[in-house]
Amino acid sequence: MDALSETLRVVRLVGAIFINARFTAPWCYQSPRADTVAPVLEPGAERVVIFHLITEGECYVEMANEPPVRLVAGDAIVFPQGDAHRMTSQPGLPPATGGRLDRVLARRPRQLDYGGGGPATRLVCGYLACDARLAGMLLTGLPSLVRVNVRGSNAGAWLEASVRYALAEARSPRPGGAGVLSKLAEVLFIEVLRLYMNEQSEGRTGWLAGVGDRVVGAALKAMHKDPAHAWTLDELARTASSSRSVLAERFQQLVGSSPMQYLTQWRMLLAANLLSRSNAPLASIAEDVGYQTDTAFSRAFRREYGAPPAAWRRSQSMRVQA
C-alpha cells in the first residue's frame, strides 16, 4: 500500500454534506471560513475541508488578496485551509442576501436555486470534517486553493455519474443515504488529491509533493508500510536508492522534517488512532508502532500530545460522550 492510501486509511473523513446549487447570472454566493460552520457539519470537528465541483456552466471563485479564478464545468476546487471565499458569475459582485453557507446548511433539503435569470451554473458543494493532526500532515504545503479538472482523468466519467447519483440521494433520502454521500464525498476528495499530485510542478513542497518524489516517496512508502520496523537513515536511504545526505536534504525540503522526526510523528498518529478507536492495551499499541517498552512509548506520546497515552485515551472517550 502506498503512503497516500495508508494515510487515507487512518484519516477519518466524516460528516459529508452535499449541496446541490443552481445559480443564474448574475449571482454571488458567500462561503465563510470553514471553522465557522464546522459545528453544523460535525459537532466537535477539529478540521473541515471544503470543496466544490462545477457540473455545468462557468463561474469565478474569489478569495481575499487573490485574483479571481475562472472555473468551468469539470473543475473541482478544494480549500485545504478552510478559507472564506465567494463563488460568483463575475468578479466584484456583492453576495446575495441569504446566500451564505451557514444559513443554507440550516435548510432541508440542502439546495440552492436563485439568481438573475441569466446563464445557469450548477455546483456540487462538499464539506468533510477530519482529524486535525492527520489532516495537517496530509494537507501541509498545499496552497489556499487547489484546482483540478476531473473530466480529464480516467475516473472522471465515473465521478460525475456518482455525483449525479449523490444528488438524487439528496433529493429523495433513503435509509443509508447519508453513508453513501459520505463515501462519495471522500472518493471525490481523494481523486482531487491524486490529480493534484499528477499535475505537480517544480518547486512545490509539502507531504503530497514528498509522496510524488522518487526518493522521498520511496522512504515514505517504507515507513508507512512497516512503521514498527526499527528504521535507520542508512536503511531508508538504501530503500530509496539514495545516499543518506540526499535523502535527508530532500526530505527536509519537501516534508519539512527529517526522516526520523517524521517516523516518530507517523507512529504517534497511528498510536492516537488506535487509542481512540480500539480498546487494545497500551503494551500492544506500543509494539504495533515500534516501541519495545510502555515507558518509551508513553514518553514519546506525551511529547507529541501533551499527555500520557492512558490519560489521552480517557479524554477522547469523554469528548465523544459529551
Predicted regions and their residues:
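Double-stranded beta-helix
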Residues: Q90-T121, R133-R147
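A short, N-terminal "cap"/entry segment at the start of jelly-roll beta-barrel domains
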Residues: M1-Q30, A120-R122, G136-N154, A322
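An amphipathic alpha-helical interaction segment
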Residues: V124-R147, R151-K221, R238
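Short acidic-glycine-tyrosine-enriched beta hairpin
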Residues: N65-Q81
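Generic protein-terminus/edge-of-domain signal
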Residues: M1-V69, R86-L112
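N-terminal basic, amphipathic alpha-helical segments
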Residues: A76-V78, A84-Q90, S298, R319-V320
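Short helix-to-turn junction characteristic of helix-turn-helix DNA-binding domains
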Residues: I54, M223-D226, L275
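Basic/polar phosphate-binding segments, predominantly the helix-turn-helix DNA-binding elements
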Residues: V187, E191-M197, A218-L269, A286-A311
